[in-house]
Amino acid sequence: MIQISDLLLIANVSPEVAGSSGFNMIASFFAAALLIVIPAATFLIFVSQNDSLDRTSATRRR
């Protein structure tokens, strides 16, 4: 079985570049979570809670 380090040497990629690339990929995942996923989830939870309250109060009025 070929080791990852052998693949990096065959591809002529230095370990520093590979490490930097991996770090930047993980950092971009965290940035996406902070900028997109967390605000979207917060908004959806807020809207669903308000909709639930509106439906509950509308049912009581009938």
From Swiss-Prot:
UniProt similarity note: Belongs to the PsbX family. Type 2 subfamily.
Coiled-coil intervals: none
Gene name per UniProt: psbX
HAMAP family reported for this sequence: PSII_PsbX_2
Any single GO CC term annotated in Swiss-Prot or TrEMBL for this entry: photosystem II
Lineage: superkingdom: Bacteria
Name this protein carries in UniProt: Photosystem II reaction center X protein
Subcellular location(s) per record: Cellular thylakoid membrane
Oligomeric and partner information: PSII consists of a core antenna complex that captures photons, and an electron transfer chain that converts photonic excitation into a charge separation. PSII forms dimeric complexes.
Function: Involved in the binding and/or turnover of quinones at the Q(B) site of Photosystem II.
Bilayer topology term: Single-pass membrane protein
SS bond list: none
GO biological process, one term: photosynthesis
UniProt keywords, alphabetically: Membrane, Photosynthesis, Photosystem II, Thylakoid, Transmembrane, Transmembrane helix
Membrane-crossing segments per the record: 26-46
Pfam families: PsbX
